[in-house]
UniProtKB/Swiss-Prot annotation:
The keyword Hydrolase applies. Belongs to the archaeal IMP cyclohydrolase family. This is IMP cyclohydrolase. It catalyses: IMP + H2O = 5-formamido-1-(5-phospho-D-ribosyl)imidazole-4-carboxamide. Keywords: Hydrolase, Purine biosynthesis. Pathway: Purine metabolism; IMP biosynthesis via de novo pathway; IMP from 5-formamido-1-(5-phospho-D-ribosyl)imidazole-4-carboxamide: step 1/1. GO terms for molecular function: IMP cyclohydrolase activity. Its EC number is 3.5.4.10. Transmembrane segments: none annotated. One of its GO terms (biological process) is 'de novo' IMP biosynthetic process. Pfam families: IMP_cyclohyd. InterPro entries: IMP_cyclohydrolase, IMP_cyclohydrolase-like, IMP_cyclohydrolase-like_sf. It comes from the Archaea.
Length: 194
């Protein structure tokens, strides 16, 4: 089944996977501000604004994961003290779904320093933001409402590997984030197409 890009969030780990039929020549790179999706050296040039973006950022004791440029305003809001639910809701509403040929939803999740976790999606027909207490998946297609999923990862590296190898079609790369402990920051990891 092809579900597109997806996030898995909560309660102490998060993951993001790029799954793509249209732009498979992408990889994740580590930058000081977090993890960024970029085209590979052999990718065709494109002006598509949805191909390269920060997909993981940590700031203000929070970790934010998502499938596009909305990761940045969510991160800025939690860093300024917004509750994660409000940061997700406001940024998703403001940026809306992607204005591409598929009306691709924007998906995101937040791990908070107090041990809580949230997941959200904005689609053409809805905005959903939820607190989660078990690993919860939301994807751009087919599984476009938050649902519990079996996800056993405990570390960032395990989360990235488990997301990458999940039984959904067209895996390109994956990111993982894990909380070191309540209030102790986060570890990140990447898996690029081997």
């Amino acid at each position: 089944m092809y579900i597109g890009r997806f996030v898995v969030v909560g309660p102490s780990v998060a993951a993001y996977r790029v799954s793509s039929r249209s732009f498979p020549n992408r990889k994740l790179i580590e930058r000081p501000a977090g993890l960024t999706v970029v085209p590979t050296a052999d990718a065709e040039e494109t002006t598509n604004p949805y191909v390269s973006y920060n997909c993981v950022r940590t700031a203000g004791g929070h970790a934010v994961v998502g499938n596009g440029s909305h990761v940045d305003p969510i991160t800025e809001k939690v860093e300024r003290g917004y509750p994660p639910r409000d940061a997700l809701t406001e940024a998703l509403l403001a940026m809306d779904y992607e204005k591409d040929d598929y009306d691709t939803p924007r998906i995101a999740g937040v791990l908070a320093p107090d041990g809580t976790a949230y997941v959200g999606i904005v689609r053409a027909d809805a905005v959903l933001v939820r607190a989660v207490e078990e690993p919860t998946l939301v994807a751009t297609y087919e599984k476009d409402a938050p649902e519990a999923i079996g996800f056993d990862a405990a570390t960032a590296a395990d989360a990235a590997r488990e997301a990458y190898s999940a039984a959904f079609e067209h895996a390109v790369c994956a990111a993982g984030v894990s909380r070191r402990g309540v209030g102790d920051g986060y570890d990140t990891a990447v898996v690029n197409d081997p």
